[in-house]
């Protein structure tokens, strides 16, 4: 039985992909068998898995960090944009259909079924599964059809770390707003906040850490410095 952990974000480009890679390498270095996972990824760039199927470059790179062979189970649904609001849908590494947004919505249950198959496989074959969310985990206009964030974390009974980019400003509002807008059953999955891309003296954040914990009952689990490289 695997332990599932999801890194979700308050926005795109908050640092989820790199953070998942880092956690994968840390656990792999401790001797655990670790799998990265992103249920649904939209990307034109793909790599070949050990099963001779396509997965997103991000999950391929994360598998290198985890020191495991890349598998289609790491990215069961890959969307490759084709223009005119249409994407080629890749399921478990193989082309499935070309679908526009509304057509894809009608395939949601099938995609969830395939995501569950991958979660079951990973649960049986790995010690840890480090999941990556997509974009913001709380786009309230899209929650009903979101199969990349907390719906999948709930399916996997995953603990969720919510990461936000302080370099953009408004980090505490982003964390608080995200938590408050989530449905209660998903909100309780969040076990800690991670503040990413911080520059300067961390002492200036002390009051903010205290207040966000008072408001949400969720601790700040990590502060990641900005990497100039």
UniProtKB/Swiss-Prot annotation:
A single GO molecular function term of this UniProt record: catalytic activity
TM stretches of this protein: none
rRNA-binding is among the record's keywords: no
Pfam families cross-referenced by the UniProt entry: CbiA
Keywords: Cobalamin biosynthesis, Glutamine amidotransferase
SUPFAM superfamilies: P-loop containing nucleoside triphosphate hydrolases (SSF52540)
Family: Belongs to the CobB/CobQ family. CobQ subfamily.
Primary role: Catalyzes amidations at positions B, D, E, and G on adenosylcobyrinic A,C-diamide. NH(2) groups are provided by glutamine, and one molecule of ATP is hydrogenolyzed for each amidation.
Protein's name according to its UniProt entry: Probable cobyric acid synthase
Organism whose genome encodes this protein: Methanococcus voltae
